[in-house]
Amino acid sequence: MVMSGIIGDNFFIPSLFILSMFLAFFFRKRIVRKILFLEFDENVKNLAPRDFFYSILKMEKSIKSFYLAEILFLLADILFILFGGYAMYLERLELSKKYSYLLISPASFVLDHLTLPIILWVIMFFLLLLTLFMIKKEKKRVSDMLNYLNKYNILNSAKTDFFNSDKIIKSEVILQSDIKLGDKYLFSIYTAYILPYSWIKDVKIEKVHGRGGSGGFYYLNFTLNKSFNPVRIFFAKKETAEQVKKFLLKKAFY
């Protein structure tokens, strides 16, 4: 009866789904903040510049909370479906024996109550596949970026700048981590960027509109004097984007 009562509550699995996503975002934010405020092991601090930046910028680090949340939800949901569904089936079978006038078969009744958990399991499974794909793709992008920066012999000074800087700007956008503005470089953990100010040719503020043309967020669209990957830094507030743009252009040209 307890299990069937839980299954009958249509809010249990959706609530678990929402909670797992909330915790993933919460812990990802914590991980990023620790990196920006240099709260990591001495072993990491003592790595060579390229290894150091790869260690803190690799997607596995910032997205690990999502990966774990997705796996835990999939396990919890499948156990819920298998064991809870079986318990509910047995209970419904007993009722159908006592009350022969019940028109819905036990299997159909259970399937009807488990439709939402099954749909959420499928959604989370595809999110997990997407996460694994993004990790693989981002790993290559970060590695290529660091190799490109290393060609210009700037990773040593970038590491020094990263440790000496304490200017943290909040993006307040889910898909963009807070950024660190050093004396010579911009640092973003997610999406991973190390951008020398001297490479900036121009910065424009663009807007991504929300549904119905209202809301949305802003991003800095960079024009660079090097053949670097496109760089976009997102912010929830236009005022923040304008302040960062002004700071970057000042550093780039003065």
Model-flagged regions — what are they?
Residues 33-55:
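Short, charged cytosolic
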Residues 2-13, 59-63, 99-119:
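Membrane-interface segments at the starts/ends of alpha-helical transmembrane spans
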Residues 176-210:
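Phosphoinositide-binding peripheral membrane targeting modules
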Residues 48-66, 123-180:
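Anionic N-terminal interaction surfaces
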Residues 1, 12-23, 68-90, 121-127:
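Canonical alpha-helical transmembrane segments of integral membrane proteins
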Residues 204-254:
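Acidic, Ser/Thr- and proline-rich intrinsically disordered linker/docking segments
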Residues 24-41, 86-97, 128-154:
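Transmembrane-cytosolic junction motif
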Residues 1-39:
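Membrane-anchoring hydrophobic segments
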